[in-house]
Amino acid sequence: TIDALFLNEDRHTHNIAVLMNGKGDYAYCPIFDNGAGLLADTTMDYPLSGDVYRLMDNVQSKTICSEFDEQLDISEALYKTNLKFNFTKKDVTELLKNAEAYPKEIRNRVETIIFAQMRKYSYLFSSV
């Protein structure tokens, strides 16, 4: 679910994990390795000069199948919708405003991507 929202095309079985404590109890591991999300590969696959919406359409998932929506449908059919996001567009804008280490062009692109994904998956948000 989170990979569909952030267009992380690099989720695979080497970055899905569980935690175990000293008693042998297991727990879910926090999500990690999201470096391929948000069209991050601007040098080869997702150039900054490209149309962001076309590029978003080209992203393919890897875990179960190549389509994020199909993966999401499978997950929700098996486990229901159990992930909700609690951030708003205002939160995204504020966060990006403070990410001054990144060029404005990158921050604007990230905002465009996240806003589009928030619209697409609005049912996953408490308030958009």
Where are these regions (language model features)?
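Anionic ligand-binding catalytic core segments
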Residues: 2-8, 12-13, 17-128
